[in-house]
Structure formats: structure tokens, C-alpha cells
Amino acid sequence: MQRDCVSPTKLENRIKKIVHKPFFKIALFSTTSMTVLGSVVIAPSLPALQSHFQNIAGIDFLSKLVLTLPALFVMLFSPLSGYLLDRYGRIKFLFPAMAIWSLSGFSGFFLDNIYLILVSRAIFGIATAFVMTGATALVGDYYLGEDRQKALGLQGFATAVGSAVFISLGGYLSSIDWRYPFLAYLLGIAIAIFAYTKLFEPHRKKTKKTHKEVEGSNQKFNFLMFLPVYLLVFFCMVAYYISPTQIPFFIVHNLGKNGDIVGISMSASSIAYGVFSLFYNRFRNIWSIYGIYALGLFLMGTCFLLLYVFHNYLIVMVSLMFLGAGGGLLIVNSSSYLLSIAPEMQRAKALGFFASAIFLGQFFSPLMTQPIVDRMSILGLFLIFTCLLYMLGLFFIFKSRMKKNFRKLQS
């Protein structure tokens, strides 16, 4: 009863103090980082997994599907998760999803059937949809304005640091046995318990009027307004996911390195992703949305240009840092822009489709890139994506210039 009597201003001030506490941020951003760990942690074990199931027909494709199948189910269930989270709240779905995420991910450790592993990865993807949408929606609920831009940068940094640590660990564990990286998913249980003690349901009015507003906002959801962001994110994730789906094979087969080296290489990308995400707010204070898009695309394009021209391990490390830097800017920039234009009562729904675009890109990445590798070799793949990313970057430079000229004419 006492809580209901608190004025909105006092309540908002109290919430603002809570959400800026260090342990609260650790709980929140650990939760958001879980979704990325879901894929990268097992990437170094793919060559060994493929060898283990070498007698299975189509294992070349199925082994990559172990990594990307969750993305398909995230794509399918993220819009539903967004609707449910907007309608009924965030927390009641988030914590059960985190538990399912951990258990279904861990099951790959003891399953010895590639098809059962794929089933477990599908369940894992459904849980990921709720965790990713719920956690990112909480960031949008807890923080506003510049605080939100900083929070999104911290989210990207926490995700990347966790990714770097666990993909390195995954690379080391995969050098022992391909099953061991699946043990890392048990960390989700510890994160869920810690988050349960810190996170809370954001203050939302629960009057009949609000429920009608929610129903109206659901009917008026303007998908086309967000579509350009979704398409751009989809393409960027197709390009970004060349790293875990194709480059491990390039390192092992073309450069003759071991699985533990693959993990270290992937972690270089994650570290750069985190650093550039962390400083996103500073980039945003200098450059426009279009300018940051152009920078991110040029950085990613430079990665594939270096891989195409130079064929040694040091260049792979440097190029993956370019890829991570560009990917970090692009995803955080898109998240920030999306949260700034999405109405409050449609925030989770907009983020649900955003998650769908991200994971749809992850799922389609090997489907779109493997035929190019088969026909033109992996070097041909690098050249094609160099050209595509540079051309798209030039497009955003043109858009940025046009916008500046339009403002000058208005003034």
C-alpha cells in the first residue's frame, strides 16, 4: 500500500538511484550478455564436432546448424516474446527463460545424437528470444536519454567482455573435447539467481485505460517505420557471422592452427566489439546516426579486405578486431535509434522484431555464404563482402551529406 502512495516523481528518483548501483548494473548486463554467449562459446568446437559425427550425411551443413539453428527460433519467437512482455511484464518471463536457456544449452554436453543436439538448440533458441528481448527492454525501461545511450554502450561492452572470456575458454575446452564448451551454459543458472536478487519489474500503470492503450498500440504498430533498421541489422549479422561460421575453418584448414587458437582469435573480435560499444556515447556526440553507420560498415569491410589480401594469423587477429569494432558500433547504434523512436508501450515489440532481424541474419549467414565458398572459395567470399560493405558505407555517407545540406537549406 505504501508503494502505491509514492508519487511518480519520488518513485522515479528512487528507481534512478537503484539502477545506477554497481551490483544492479552487473546483474542487468550479465543477463543481456547471456544471449551472445549462447552462440560464440561453442564456435571453436565446430570442426571437432564435425569430425565426431563425420559418418552422418550432410554433417558439413549440420555442424554449422548447431551454431545457427537457435537463431531461427529466436527469429520466430522474438515477436511473440515482445508482445507477451509488453502485455504482461518483463520479469515473470525473464527468469524462467534464463533457466531453460541454461539447461537446454548444457544438454549438448551429454547428448550423442546430432539430431537431438539440434532439438536442444531449438529449445535454446526459444529461451534466448525471451531473454534477449526481456533484458534489452529492461535497459530501455530503466534508463532514459543520455543515460540510455551509456547503458547500451555498457551492455555492448559487458556482452563483448563475456564473449571474449568464454570463447577463449570454449577454444581451450574444445581442444580437450568438443563437448566441454557446453558446460559453460551452466553459468546461466548463477546469473539467473544473482539477477533475481537485483532486478525488478519497471513501474507500469495497470489501469483499465492502460490496457486499452496497449491494445490500441498493438493494432497500430508501424512495422514499416522500423523496417530499414531491421534490414540493415539483418545484413550486418550475415556479414558478422562469417566470423564464427567460416573463419574457424579458414584458421584450422588454411592456416593450420588448432582449436584453442580459434578461440583466441574470436575473442579479439569480441574485445574490439566491447571497446567500441563502451565509447558509443562519445561517437554519438560527434557523429550522426548515419555517420556511425558508415564508420561501422567501413570497419567491417576492412576486415574482409585484409583477410582477402593477407593470409597469416596475425592479420586474422587484426582483421577480426576491425570486424568487432564495426559490429559493436552498428548494433549499439541501431538499438539506440530503435529505442528513441519506439513508443513506450510498443518498446518490447519493436525490440522483438529487432532480435528477430539479428538472429535471422545469424541463421542465414551460413546458408548465404557456404554456396559462395563452395563455388568461389572462402577468399571469394571475403572479396564479395568487402565490396558490399564498402558500397553500403558510401551510401550512408551520401545520406549523411544529404541530411546536412537539407538542414542548411532550411536554415
Question: Which residues does each PLM region occupy?
Answer:
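Extracellular/periplasmic helix-loop-helix junction of adjacent transmembrane segments
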Residues: 46-75
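Central cavity-lining transmembrane alpha-helices of secondary-active solute carriers
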Residues: 65-82, 267-279
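Conserved MFS/SLC helix-loop-helix module at the cytosolic interface between two early adjacent transmembrane helices
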Residues: 75-113
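Helix-to-loop junctions at the C-terminal end of transmembrane segments
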Residues: 77-89, 276-288, 373
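Paired small-residue
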Residues: 100, 104, 115-123, 314-322
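Cytoplasmic helix-loop-helix junction between adjacent transmembrane helices
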Residues: 114, 120-159
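Helix-loop-helix hairpin linking two adjacent transmembrane segments in secondary transporters
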Residues: 145, 154-200
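Extracytoplasmic gate region of multi-pass secondary transporters
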Residues: 226-267
